[in-house]
Amino acid sequence: MEGQRCIALIAHDEKKDDMADFARHHQKVLASFRIVATGTTGGRVQEACPGLEVIRLKSGPLGGDQQIGAMIATGEVDMLIFFTDPLTAMPHDVDVKALTRLATVYDIPMALNRATAENLIDFNSAD
């Protein structure tokens, strides 16, 4: 939809259940966004919330993080919610760092954990 804000959803493997639960609890607010997600995360969100339309990109390690980074750089993504797992080493860690760097450079709201994501969603539901 033209003019609709876009939110990107990403979750590391150990955080995918948390992302699905987050989406389930905030389905009404998320429905007001254009949603893009990395492949597996997007699948989990769709399973949890069949009513949400989710554009699934590649899996993070296969380039999905970079696809979302490119969308941030071109102004297509307005907000990033990325549930990271700081306790597990990621082979594609440089992609993760590049993605969070782009969100910072382009000054879009970014949540890296559930507590911050809850605050961002609550703030956006007040619009």
Swiss-Prot record:
Claim: Lyase is one of the keywords in the record: yes
InterPro entries the UniProt entry points to: Methylgl_synth (IPR004363), Methylglyoxal_synth_AS (IPR018148), MGS-like_dom (IPR011607), MGS-like_dom_sf (IPR036914)
PROSITE patterns: METHYLGLYOXAL_SYNTH (PS01335), MGS (PS51855)
GO MF assignments: methylglyoxal synthase activity
Active site: 65
A cellular component annotation (GO) from this entry: cytosol
Binding site for substrate: 12, 16, 38-41, 59-60, 92
GO biological process entries: methylglyoxal biosynthetic process
Catalysed conversion reaction: dihydroxyacetone phosphate = methylglyoxal + phosphate
Statement: the UniProt record of this protein carries the keyword NAD: no
Domain (MGS-like) ranges: 1-127
Entry keywords, A to Z: Lyase
Enzyme Commission numbers on file: 4.2.3.3
NCBIfam families, A to Z: MGSA, PRK05234.1
Known function: Catalyzes the formation of methylglyoxal from dihydroxyacetone phosphate.
Record family assignment: Belongs to the methylglyoxal synthase family.
Protein name, entry field: Methylglyoxal synthase
Organism of derivation: Agrobacterium fabrum (strain C58 / ATCC 33970) (Agrobacterium tumefaciens (strain C58))
Underlying gene: mgsA
